[in-house]
């Protein structure tokens, strides 16, 4: 690809209302899996001024204190004062949790064959490319790093006027399919009322943006829009309602790859919306790392109650060193994409999900689906 183009992705902070909901959902999931790895969990959360509503379907032998977990997450994020419009100590926590439908359960847990079927029908995508060291698209990878840096500056006291809610949007210029320049940075962060706008703009540009983005990508043409409305004091759940699963593009590839539509947070690994999307990322990343292609997008689909995928599709965008059909044959040979196979290979019945709920589910080496454990086998096909 020789054309010049720009591409934009966004990330949001851990204090963004939708991300508060995601973190509570996954914290509850982790607490349950720690006691009962075979639990069935679909936990949804709504947050608004002074209130958290936890709902969903949960079938488990475990007992967890939903209210305590919820308050701990809110405290950890940093909503610790009613002056922010949300306070971990005083907010109401309401619960509306039921059990998994027996009609769904009988399809997922086949008692005759002992085979774990997919928890629902659906289609999932995985993607990888060579444009960053973590095989992720650069716009979303660096947008996440900006949000992580902001959180560290807030929690360490480096920038004491910061508050938890924030988001950024990064537009990169591409040449020959690789990022070469930052075109635009949009950065909005909640703040205390006593910081002057010009001081905030300078601090964010110098101490956050320029400390994260490669210096060679920044120049006098780079555009910065930092708190462009001039004031962002009212934020978090006071400013906007938050819901689990509303940041699925932030959670994945920033729009660079397609998305099957299912969210991740609050779902146990029997839900292929989550586990098969992780598996698809694992497959795509190993294909690219093995040199079979410079870019790879993989689609998998499932039928409820059926273990084997109903389809596998691969697109290497003209960068493949093998035919797409040959890569699909390698996937069938080297990867078990049944729900049980995915769970076993990545050891997913563990309390590992709270950490995925912020700064993306991909691109961090601590996650088991990021392992490059199939590269040696796949590279033999070249």
From Swiss-Prot:
Mg(2+) binds at residue 18. Coiled coil: none annotated. One of its GO terms (biological process) is S-adenosylmethionine biosynthetic process. Catalyzes the formation of S-adenosylmethionine (AdoMet) from methionine and ATP. The overall synthetic reaction is composed of two sequential steps, AdoMet formation and the subsequent tripolyphosphate hydrolysis which occurs prior to release of AdoMet from the enzyme. Binds 2 divalent ions per subunit. Binds 1 potassium ion per subunit. Its cofactor is Mg(2+); K(+). Keywords: ATP-binding, Cytoplasm, Magnesium, Metal-binding, Nucleotide-binding, One-carbon metabolism, Potassium, Transferase. Belongs to the AdoMet synthase family. It is found in: Cytoplasm. Homotetramer; dimer of dimers. InterPro entries: ADOMET_SYNTHASE_CS (IPR022631), S-AdoMet_synt_C (IPR022630), S-AdoMet_synt_central (IPR022629), S-AdoMet_synt_N (IPR022628), S-AdoMet_synthetase (IPR002133), S-AdoMet_synthetase_sfam (IPR022636). K(+) binds at residue 44. One of its GO terms (cellular component) is cytoplasm. This is S-adenosylmethionine synthase. It is an enzyme of class 2 (transferase). Its EC number is 2.5.1.6. CDD domains: S-AdoMet_synt. Residues 100-110 are annotated as: Flexible loop. GO terms for molecular function: ATP binding; magnesium ion binding; methionine adenosyltransferase activity. The keyword Transferase applies. Pfam families: S-AdoMet_synt_C, S-AdoMet_synt_M, S-AdoMet_synt_N. ATP binds at residues 16, 165-167, 231-232, 240, 246-247, 267. Pathway: Amino-acid biosynthesis; S-adenosyl-L-methionine biosynthesis; S-adenosyl-L-methionine from L-methionine: step 1/1. It comes from Legionella pneumophila subsp. pneumophila (strain Philadelphia 1 / ATCC 33152 / DSM 7513). It catalyses: L-methionine + ATP + H2O = S-adenosyl-L-methionine + phosphate + diphosphate.
């Amino acid at each position: 690809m020789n054309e010049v183009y720009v591409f934009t992705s966004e990330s949001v902070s851990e204090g963004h209302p939708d991300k508060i909901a995601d973190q509570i959902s996954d914290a509850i999931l982790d607490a349950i899996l720690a006691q009962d790895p075979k639990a069935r969990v679909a936990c949804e959360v709504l947050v608004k001024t002074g209130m958290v509503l936890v709902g969903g379907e949960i079938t488990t032998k475990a007992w967890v204190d939903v209210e305590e977990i919820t308050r701990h997450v809110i405290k950890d994020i940093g909503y610790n004062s009613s002056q922010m419009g949300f306070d971990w100590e005083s907010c109401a926590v309401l619960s509306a949790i039921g059990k998994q439908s027996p009609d769904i359960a009988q399809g997922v847990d086949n008692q005759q064959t002992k085979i774990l079927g997919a928890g629902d029908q659906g289609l999932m995508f995985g993607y990888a490319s060579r444009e960053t060291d973590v095989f992720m698209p650069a716009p979303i990878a660096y947008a996440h790093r900006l949000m992580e840096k902001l959180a560290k500056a807030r929690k360490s006291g480096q920038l004491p006027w910061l508050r938890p809610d924030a988001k950024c949007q990064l537009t990169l210029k591409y040449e020959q399919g690789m990022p070469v320049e930052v075109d635009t940075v949009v950065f909005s962060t909640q703040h205390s009322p006593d910081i002057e706008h010009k001081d905030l703009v300078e601090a964010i540009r110098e101490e956050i943006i320029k400390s994260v983005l490669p210096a060679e990508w920044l120049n006098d043409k780079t555009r910065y829009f930092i708190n462009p409305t001039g004031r962002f004091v009212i934020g978090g759940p006071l400013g906007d309602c938050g819901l689990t699963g509303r940041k699925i593009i932030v959670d994945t590839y920033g729009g660079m790859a397609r998305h099957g539509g299912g969210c991740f947070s609050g779902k146990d690994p029997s839900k292929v919306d989550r586990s098969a999307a992780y598996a698809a990322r694992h497959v795509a990343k190993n294909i690219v790392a093995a040199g079979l292609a410079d870019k790879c997008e993989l689609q998998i689909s499932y039928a409820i109650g059926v273990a084997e995928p109903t389809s596998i599709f691969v697109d290497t965008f003209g960068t493949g060193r093998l035919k797409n059909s040959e890569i699909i044959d390698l996937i069938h040979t080297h990867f078990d994409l049944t729900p049980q196979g995915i769970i076993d290979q990545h050891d997913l019945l563990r309390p590992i999900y709270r950490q995925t709920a912020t700064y993306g589910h991909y691109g961090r080496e601590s996650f088991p689906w990021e392992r490059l454990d199939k590269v040696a086998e796949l590279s033999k096909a070249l």
